[in-house]
Amino acid sequence: MKFFLDTANVEKIKEFNALGLVDGVTTNPSLIKKEGRDFYEVIKEICSIVDGPVSAEVIALDAEGMVKEARELVKIAENVVVKIPMTKEGMKAVNTLSNEGIKTNVTLIFSANQALLAAKAGASYVSPFVGRLDDVGQDGMFLISEVMQVFGAYGIETEVIVASVRHPIHVLESAKMGADIATIPFDVLDKLFNHPLTDNGIAKFLADWEAHTNR
């Protein structure tokens, strides 16, 4: 499974990319706003750091506006993927962009039907949101299992990006279900490194070594 970093924080992207853990990056207007920088500058810098796909989202709500923005976004770098919302106008834009060879990531997906529609429209990626479904009392990971089942049944090549990841269990369950990608906030990715028994083991080894060398 590929790991994307769900952030627009350039320093964090550099940090995890240096570990060989970043296969791509996803951004959205909220993440860009947190950085307080020019949108195009941030995307351009991220694309210079990461070789893999970098999702940049359109703001327009109509298909014509989305297509116009998308054509400008892909001029930033070859690895830009245009993020499009899951709406009827969005799917119209995805179909147009797909025919032009522009890669798209359909975001804000909350049902398998939406994922299927996006794939049929020509999306390169779909992003089902698991955490937000959990927030309203639904089972976010069940959505991933449904999407993987449908895509597998028909050999659909659209890649599934598990989004709205809130904790390490989401990452593990995504991997077990065979999801192509999980896009992970850096604070959650940090947690994947940790286990109390690892810390205890290191402390024990160091204590034993110190006792051995001080004999």
UniProtKB/Swiss-Prot annotation:
* The enzyme's E.C. designation: 2.2.1.2
Q: Which residues form the active site?
A: 83
UniProt superkingdom: Archaea
**Pathway note:** Carbohydrate degradation; pentose phosphate pathway; D-glyceraldehyde 3-phosphate and beta-D-fructose 6-phosphate from D-ribose 5-phosphate and D-xylulose 5-phosphate (non-oxidative stage): step 2/3
Q: Which UniProt keywords apply?
A: Cytoplasm, Pentose shunt, Schiff base, Transferase
Q: Does the keyword Transferase apply?
A: yes
**Where does the UniProt entry say this protein principally localizes?**
cytoplasm
GO terms (molecular function) for this protein are: aldehyde-lyase activity; transaldolase activity
Concerning its family, UniProt says: Belongs to the transaldolase family. Type 3B subfamily.
Show the HAMAP family listed in the entry.
Transaldolase_3b
- Biological role: Transaldolase is important for the balance of metabolites in the pentose-phosphate pathway.
Q: What is this protein called?
A: Probable transaldolase
Gene source species:
Methanococcus maripaludis (strain C5 / ATCC BAA-1333)
Organism lineage: Archaea, Methanobacteriati, Methanobacteriota, Methanomada group, Methanococci
